């Protein structure tokens, strides 16, 4: 009788093995810089005098929108006793459109950019001892071809002297194309075209030691930045040829007695 009662409480639970994913992301931005009665010689350059507002008045309108479609296939973590991690493979197509005043100030000039990227993600979130999340994405076709993003983080947790110790690490490496408005901009008083900018290289390595009971934390990180793109004081685009290093250190200790 007891065996029959136990069997009656058993139930089958469906655990999905694979997910097919599609995401659509749309963004639209519009910016207007409007000014009247600009002081004489206030701006160094004037590229057109006509437009919506002529003379010394300014009406610079910039538009930008992008449409991004991502398709992914995911093998879910835990669907099989031998599958200790989840795996996702994805591909993305992005369309970007930009619109700014043309050289007459009356019409408008537009630019279109397409990009195709592929990537993968490996992650483990279940369990209490080990977790990790690794992701890689590279751009194959388009304006940003050659871009690369590598991200990784992991943590190990274990008990020590009535406390829980966590050792965590995080790192990333990015090779990124400077964004559109570093490369092109058109307005009544500011205008530039920079098609030969180098890709920025960003590297980050971080280690974290923490104790749960005493809320003690020590974090050390190193950042390296190469080919940094920036504006000079006169709005000329520059690319730094030197490496920039940052080493932040955080020590956080809160100790209290448990009665």
Question: Residues of each region from the PLM?
Answer:
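Exposed, low-structure sequence patches enriched in small/polar residues
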Residues: 3-259
């Amino acid at each position: 009788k007891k065996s029959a009662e136990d069997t009656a409480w058993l139930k089958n639970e469906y655990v999905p093995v694979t997910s097919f994913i599609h995401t659509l992301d749309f963004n639209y931005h519009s910016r207007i810089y409007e000014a009247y009665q600009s002081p004489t010689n206030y701006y160094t350059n004037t590229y057109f005098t006509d437009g919506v507002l002529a003379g010394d008045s300014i009406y610079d309108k910039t538009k930008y929108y992008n449409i991004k479609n991502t398709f992914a296939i995911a093998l879910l973590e835990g669907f099989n006793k031998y599958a200790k991690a989840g795996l996702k493979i994805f591909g993305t197509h992005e369309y970007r459109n930009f619109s700014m005043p043309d050289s007459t100030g009356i019409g408008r000039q537009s630019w279109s950019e397409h990009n195709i990227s592929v990537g993968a993600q490996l992650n483990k979130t279940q369990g209490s001892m080990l977790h990790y999340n690794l992701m890689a994405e590279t751009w194959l076709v388009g304006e940003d071809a050659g871009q690369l993003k590598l991200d990784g983080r992991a943590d190990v947790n274990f008990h020590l002297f009535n406390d829980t110790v966590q050792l965590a690490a995080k790192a990333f490496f990015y090779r990124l194309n400077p964004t559109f408005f570093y490369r092109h901009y058109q307005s009544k008083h500011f205008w530039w075209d920079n098609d030969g900018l180098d890709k920025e290289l960003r590297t980050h390595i971080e280690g974290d030691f923490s104790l749960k009971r005493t809320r003690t934390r020590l974090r050390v990180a190193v950042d390296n930045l190469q080919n940094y793109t920036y504006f000079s004081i006169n709005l000329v685009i520059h690319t730094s040829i030197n490496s920039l290093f940052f080493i932040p250190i955080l020590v956080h200790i809160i100790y209290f007695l448990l009665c």
